[in-house]
């Protein structure tokens, strides 16, 4: 316990660090993920392999190591975030392990994903150790903006970018492949926050009123125009609707939060929809993507993936087929783009809804961290990063259920892919650093205030 905030009536809130609560929830997260791995082995092979204790021990050790660093470096951080992320990451590992058995047990995607998980946690810890004050990131918004756009456009460079399944979102260096847009996701959120905080007064100025809605001034449209052009380039030349929607949506939401003007949000939505209609009219591959969404059964061969995903979700029903008892391998890319369908088939609608609830809680804790932040830059940066995770999940679940066109985005922490997993672990580190600063008592207050009267002390919750 430590002294926290003093209110006007003299009441002192004692902020609990809540690290033991975090450790207890991490044990539950470990049991859920490793339990899925165990049930997969029992349902498929009817016996556990000799390595099961090693797998479980390493799985648990990784969680404990991350907890120890959080306890030492950011002891006041939100105690709920890390267990939720470990639960999602563990479920993803267990499902990828299950899919490795299709059609035979010769694939080792889980081994690769486990290594990426370990590397992600290493970078999570490194971020905690290096970024002691998130406000240092505010110094270079324009440099970060340029770096983010460069990474976003790298797949268009001849000889470096590579096209996979119709989308040009990968780069390859030797035998290593990566999605640089995942780096851009973090860098641009930080750059947007720095730029918008510095230019808030200018961007908040009112322009003309149309239908009762105050629109921004024409001279202030430069930033949103740049992002619109970048988004259209991604959609048209990289054939990646998901990434374009993700970045443009993140920028417009952060712009709205900064200015509190509905006109920016409406202008952003209208311009994105207008660009999408223009791309649909002018480019054949964009029309194919939308036609597959609206009329999937008109071409069974072309739309095989989304059709099988619908069948898989229907076969899973409410309770699911059980770990290792479904047929998720009928859906191409069941371990990456369509891992949500695999979860829905084997764990049912109930399991899929539980995963969605976990993402909702994760986003809510991020937004709570944003609201409690003491500086505008941190508030906006955390809101942008949290919204990015929420929008990504919405696009994925909407795609596999045909609420939206397929976007090609991956489920955070669950889908196979090193770039996405590492970037998301860095996002979690940044959010937890800010939450630590929010809940940590001010040094000058701790140094000068006497011990509180026990009758005035109130135990703090899991802020």
How would you label these PLM feature ranges?
Residues 3-4, 34, 56-70, 87-95, ...:
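Central hydrophobic cores of alpha-helical transmembrane segments in multi-pass inner-membrane proteins
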Residues 3, 7-13, 397-463:
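A juxtamembrane structural motif centered on a specific transmembrane helix
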Residues 153, 162-177, 256, 264-355, ...:
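Hydrophobic, glycine- and aromatic-enriched re-entrant/interface helices and adjoining loop segments
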Residues 36-52, 68-76, 98-105, 130-135:
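Short, hydrophobic transmembrane alpha-helix segments
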Residues 218-281, 293-295:
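Hydrophobic alpha-helical segments of polytopic membrane proteins
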Residues 57-62, 115-123, 345-364:
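Hydrophobic alpha-helical transmembrane segments
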Residues 77-85, 108, 112, 126-151, ...:
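Interfacial loop-to-transmembrane-helix boundary motif in multi-pass membrane proteins
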Residues 370-408, 414:
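Loop-to-helix entry and N-terminal half of a specific, functionally important transmembrane alpha helix
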